[in-house]
């Protein structure tokens, strides 16, 4: 083993500041000289519209997988793709990478992008968004919001996360470094939960600029990130008159008083017929007097004289006018000037 190999295999016990910046050690053929014990295989189905494209690029797929000692099969009758290991396969994880590659190709990812997943530092994530929104109209609108006008939003997500992102049907396929995949998943899920992607894009741009400043490495970045308020425009209309709920009581409401109960309480029940009639007449005359009084007040409103200003207030006004100073010199000069104009004319 050479010195460079010994340096790579040396395990560091120092504390790690940034786990994302750690280099993944390469797995070589010398690390597994005996190969695989048993054969492993994975199969996936693809839609009918991908049949023509897969048939054209399948020789390239076989050539790419043969470099890693894997076998690939395309079954056009069943509409499936199969990858399996061989006796020469020495990397135990390459079959998982090959499975991800055929899954991406089934989700309309081109072969030139899908083959990148075979690299050690590249991963993939297929995000299912079909069940996140109940109504189809809302789902289509939010999915289009993720793409943006002329694909501008999707392109900005790709540039900020260093990932290839493809929106197809009910899934979003992402391919790139693992940190970028985490960011893409957060943006997609929040977009389907009615959070516009521009907010997360702006936050990513600010974080990228903050990472350049070493002084802010150990500080909280929340004060720099924008805070957006949730505005729910479609609120339910509230009634004009709200009914206030009465306090709950386990007992039934009391029985309302009848006419006889009211007469017993007032003592009217024990009066004879003549006394009852006299009481009714008295109440009637009192009501008539009150009505006549209100009517007289309404009629006499037109004959009430308006309030005049007091003599003291008028005298104050006159004193104020007389006390105003007059500039005699200015008035005299004005008269002389007017006389000169009259003579000259």
Curated annotation (Swiss-Prot):
Required for 40S ribosome biogenesis. Involved in nucleolar processing of pre-18S ribosomal RNA and ribosome assembly. Binds to RNA. Required for female germline development, cell viability during eye development and for survival of dividing cells and epithelial cells during early wing disk development. Residues 270-298 form a coiled coil. One of its GO terms (biological process) is rRNA processing. CDD domains: KH-I_KRR1_rpt1, KH-I_KRR1_rpt2. Monomer. Component of the ribosomal small subunit (SSU) processome. GO terms for molecular function: RNA binding. Residues 125-193 form the KH domain. It is found in: Nucleus, Nucleolus. Residues 232-260, 273-329 are annotated as: Disordered. PANTHER family: HIV-1 REV BINDING PROTEIN 2, 3 (PTHR12581), KRR1 SMALL SUBUNIT PROCESSOME COMPONENT HOMOLOG (PTHR12581:SF0). Belongs to the KRR1 family. It comes from Drosophila erecta (Fruit fly). Residues 276-302, 315-329 have a biased composition (Basic and acidic residues). The keyword Chaperone does not apply. Keywords: Coiled coil, Developmental protein, Nucleus, Ribonucleoprotein, Ribosome biogenesis, RNA-binding, rRNA processing. Residues 232-245 have a biased composition (Basic residues). This is KRR1 small subunit processome component homolog. InterPro entries: KH_dom, KH_dom_type_1_sf, KRR1-like_KH1, KRR1-like_KH1_euk, KRR1-like_KH2, KRR1-like_KH2_euk, rRNA_assembly_KRR1. Its main location: nucleus. SMART domains: KH. One of its GO terms (cellular component) is nucleolus. The keyword Transit peptide does not apply.
């Amino acid at each position: 083993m050479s010195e460079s190999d010994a340096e790579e295999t040396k395990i560091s016990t120092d504390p790690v500041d940034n786990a994302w910046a750690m280099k993944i050690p390469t797995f070589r053929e010398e690390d597994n000289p005996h190969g695989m014990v048993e054969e492993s295989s994975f199969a996936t189905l693809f839609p009918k519209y991908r049949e023509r494209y897969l048939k054209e690029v399948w020789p390239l797929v076989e050539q790419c997988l043969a470099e890693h000692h894997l076998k690939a099969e395309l079954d056009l009758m069943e509409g499936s793709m199969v990858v399996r290991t061989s006796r020469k396969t020495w990397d135990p994880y390459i079959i998982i990478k090959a499975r991800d590659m055929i899954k991406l190709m089934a989700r309309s990812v081109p072969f030139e992008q899908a083959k990148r997943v075979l690299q050690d530092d590249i991963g993939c994530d297929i995000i299912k968004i079909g069940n996140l929104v109940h109504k189809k109209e809302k789902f289509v609108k939010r999915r289009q919001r993720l793409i943006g006008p002329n694909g501008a939003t999707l392109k900005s997500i790709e540039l900020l996360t260093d990932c290839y992102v493809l929106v197809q049907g009910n899934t979003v396929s992402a391919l790139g470094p693992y940190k970028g995949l985490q960011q893409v998943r957060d943006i997609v899920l929040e977009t389907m939960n009615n959070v516009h992607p521009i907010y997360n894009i702006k936050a990513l741009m600010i974080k990228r600029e903050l990472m350049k400043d070493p002084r802010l490495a150990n500080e909280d970045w929340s004060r720099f990130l924008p805070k957006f308020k949730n505005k729910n425009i479609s609120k339910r209309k509230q009634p004009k008159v709200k009914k206030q709920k009465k306090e709950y009581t386990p007992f039934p409401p009391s029985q309302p008083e009848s006419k006889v109960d009211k007469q017993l309480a007032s003592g009217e029940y024990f009066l004879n017929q003549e006394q009852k009639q006299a009481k009714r007449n008295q109440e009637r005359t009192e009501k008539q007097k009150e009505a006549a009084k209100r009517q007289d007040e309404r009629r006499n409103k037109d004959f009430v004289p308006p309030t005049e200003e007091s003599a003291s207030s008028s005298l104050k006004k006159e004193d104020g006018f007389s006390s105003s100073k007059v500039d005699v010199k200015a008035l005299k000069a004005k008269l002389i000037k007017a006389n000169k104009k009259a003579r000259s004319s």
